[in-house]
Amino acid sequence: MAISANTLFHFTSKYDTLISILKSKFFLRLCLERGLWHPGNRKWAVPIVCFCDIPLSNMAEHTQKYGNYAIGIKKTWAIKQGVTPVLYVHDNSSFIGHGLDALNWSLELGEKDSEHLNERLAQVMSMFFMMKPYEGYQERDGKRKKVRFYDEREWRYLPPIGGDHLNFLTEEKFNDKTQRDSLNTYNEQYGVDFNPDVINYIIVEKEDEIVPLIHELYSIKGNFSHNSVELLSSRIISMDRIREDF
């Protein structure tokens, strides 16, 4: 069995969020993460859309952390949109040291050319935002658990880098709801739009959610033609069924 799939899955824990994506697009949302490159692993809020490259047969554990609803898109299409696999590193990886050198170099240049400091900083930071630890601790629902992030086979979409507007926040600013909501709203312009043809799967939690979802498909997104809905209806599957059959 292939380890890698031809589909990238974006998971969510809520049915309403699944419908919202189908109505519009994949929106960037700030995600608070520890900076591998920062002394003390300070947290930063990163605007990303996350996907995973795992087959249906390996989804059970993933859904426990990220939800029982998902949209699976064609990997070939995602690559054309700039969706990229993350780089998994450990404490002894030379990439972290090289990255710190690049960050310090950018800051030194920024002191000489303050007009372009934000842009230089964002370019280097975007490199770090595509890194994740090979393994580490994940905080969820007030609990801290050691996990191997490498097993998630994560892919990410980040917003374009450029201009004077920084797309990320420190943890302190992220905890300020006004600043967090403002940047999430700003980043909506960079969301990943799609059409029905690139969807390989729509996953719901329960079998009895399939028919209501088909009814939703007929009423959302103007470019969902009758034929598209017929096609998408055949691509809906429940997590209950996946757990039983795969």
Regions found by a protein language model. Give the residues of each.
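NAD-dependent ADP-ribosyltransferases
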Residues: 1-246
